[in-house]
Amino acid sequence: MPLRLIFMGTPDFSVPTLLELVAHGHEIVAVYTRAPKPGGRRGLQLQPTPVEEAARRLGVPVLTPKTLKTEEALEEFRAFDADAAVVVAYGMILPQAILDAPKLGCYNLHASLLPRWRGAAPINRAIMADDAESGVMVMKMDVGLDTGDVAMAERLAITDTMTAADLHDRLSRLGADLMVRAMAALDRGGLQLKKQSEDGVTYAAKIDKAEARIDWTKPARAVLRHIHGLSPFPGAWAELAGVSENARVKILRCELAKGSGAPGEVLDDQLTIACGEGAIRIIELQREGKARMQATDFLRGVPLKAGAKFT
């Protein structure tokens, strides 16, 4: 029979799991998400999270507490009398009392193959580290940072064409299906848990904008993975030497290419750029204050020739 679930999530990544749980008949008794933030052109409108927008379309009660550590927050959580809580990129630490409240526990969907890439930015870090694969895992939560016992996992190969946005979307859909399967097993009493290994633990630190500048002295493959791991946000960038306005360019998608030259040197009229070893060809980019565009469109307005330089 369907479970009574509390859903806790915030960004776009979380929404498919919420929708799939509803589609498979589970009763979502409440949705917890982060409070709306100022948005719009002038920051004058409060913008609800993607999860809040989805929950309101479903007619599910939405809560946006600033903390879950008060007695009032705990009593409110307990009052929903949930069988379990499903947590997908909620963005707030759950205290032990909250974790203990649902009858069957709290279950988190994490976008990595734990224990690799515990923490805030597993999708970006997996690409930037040149990992061959990523994946999603469902774990029963404890008070540690992504240290809970693992219930289920699905793997996904990372290709050289994948950006962080591409991998995000693939894992979001894969994770939604995995959580549905996990809740079905939990409902049957057949969800088996396995402790995480203490070998191979790495931490996916939050992305800092200071990391975004491209180091052209690195090998082409490392440059490609750096670019794709930061696409679209915050966007890996370089500056076009000799350009007085809008010199900064975010590179959003590229491919490995043949060629050699001084790091950052433009090698031809197709935006092939030399790296410390090998070269990349830019496919998609964005100038400061402009919309993202294909490299071919950029070259119509800025006809770069061989010998130009990115720094």
Curated annotation (Swiss-Prot):
Signal peptide: none annotated. (6S)-5,6,7,8-tetrahydrofolate binds at residues 112-115. GO terms for molecular function: methionyl-tRNA formyltransferase activity. Keywords: Protein biosynthesis, Transferase. Its EC number is 2.1.2.9. GO terms for biological process: conversion of methionyl-tRNA to N-formyl-methionyl-tRNA. HAMAP family: Formyl_trans. Belongs to the Fmt family. This is Methionyl-tRNA formyltransferase. It comes from Bradyrhizobium diazoefficiens (strain JCM 10833 / BCRC 13528 / IAM 13628 / NBRC 14792 / USDA 110). The lineage of its organism: Bacteria, Pseudomonadati, Pseudomonadota, Alphaproteobacteria, Hyphomicrobiales. The gene is fmt.
